[in-house]
Amino acid sequence: MKIIAVGMNYAQHNKELGHTQVNTEPVIFMKPDSAILKDGKPFFIPDFSNEIHYETELVVRINRLGKNIAPRFANRYYDAVTVGIDFTARDLQRKFREQRNPWELCKGFDSSAAIGTFVPVEHYKDIQN
């Protein structure tokens, strides 16, 4: 499984973190398979960070290959959703941002992406709302 994540997409949280810049393009980052934490397994705080933050996320399972999909066809490319928790080593992230370095170490460490059980989209009356 590949995790493609969109960062900086919640304006209120961006303000809480002191970010005033409005992004016109999405901030994309990836998480490796080893980041996935499933089936009620415990999360252990890593020893390389003194500041682990967490955010609740909507997780969408992509079920078809595609590229540059028009928004009106997007619903054809996913089949299930769940809730997840994105853990971030915030102290490292600040340092990496200042140095303009990638986020992998602060976002993609082992067990940094807790995900629930996927629920088929048919179980929801209006998945867009």
Indicate where each model-derived feature is located.
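Catalytic-core "active-site belt" of small-molecule-metabolizing enzymes
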Residues: 1-129
